[in-house]
Curated annotation (Swiss-Prot):
Belongs to the pyrokinin family. One of its GO terms (biological process) is neuropeptide signaling pathway. Its main location: secreted. Keywords: Amidation, Cleavage on pair of basic residues, Hormone, Neuropeptide, Secreted, Signal. The keyword Transmembrane helix does not apply. Coiled coil: none annotated. One of its GO terms (molecular function) is neuropeptide hormone activity. Expressed in the subesophageal ganglion. PROSITE patterns: PYROKININ. It comes from the Eukaryota. This is PBAN-type neuropeptides.
């Protein structure tokens, strides 16, 4: 037991002397990595990893120098005369453009009214009410009032169709026969329909 205490004491003295023999007064700017003077006694987070240093006096001085340089640059920029700065050139019309009408048209073309021309409509199309047509065309292409359906304004028929067009099957029913109140059935899973 005495021998073990003596060996342990010698080991502790050797460890303390080796640690104190190395320079432990490490400054903030000194290298704290794996390649420092302390060698194998450095217990860092990971070998070779460099830690991010918080802004020290050196970083603060560099930051203040950058601020001074930016302030000086702004001062000298404000001293420049405004005439030397690049402005957009003034846009002036130097050439007068003469517009020529297309061939076959004249300036008074818009004033001319439509003349009576023989007009043949496309198959299945009806003439619009505000479209000018000759009296002969109106008599030839006017349909019977029974064939004209109010839905033709919303649904344009296919070519050549003059019959009544129903968009869905079963829509020919008269809704006068249906009851005014509609019975609402409740579902078995207690949901309500509105």
């Amino acid at each position: 037991m005495y021998v073990q205490r003596k060996c342990l004491f010698l080991l502790a003295v050797f460890t303390i002397s080796s640690v104190s023999g190395n320079n432990n007064d490490v400054k903030d700017g000194a290298d704290r990595g794996a390649h420092s003077d302390r060698g194998g006694l450095w217990f860092g987070p990971r070998l070779g990893k460099r830690s991010l240093r918080i802004a020290t006096e050196d970083n603060r001085q560099a930051f203040f120098k950058l601020l001074e340089a930016a302030d000086a640059l702004k001062y000298y920029y404000d001293q420049l005369p405004y005439e030397m700065q690049a402005d957009e050139p003034e846009t002036r019309v130097t050439k007068k453009v003469i517009f020529t009408p297309k061939l076959g048209r004249s300036i008074a073309y818009e004033d001319k009214s439509f003349e009576n021309v023989e007009f043949t409509p496309r198959l299945g199309r009806r003439l619009a009410d505000d479209m000018p047509a000759t009296p002969a065309d109106q008599e030839i292409y006017r349909q019977d009032p029974e064939q004209i359906d109010s839905r033709t304004k919303y649904f344009s028929p296919r070519l050549g169709r003059t019959m009544n067009f129903s968009p869905r099957l079963g829509r020919e029913l008269s809704y006068d026969m249906l009851p005014n109140k509609i019975r609402v059935a409740r579902s078995t899973n207690k949901t309500r329909s509105t």
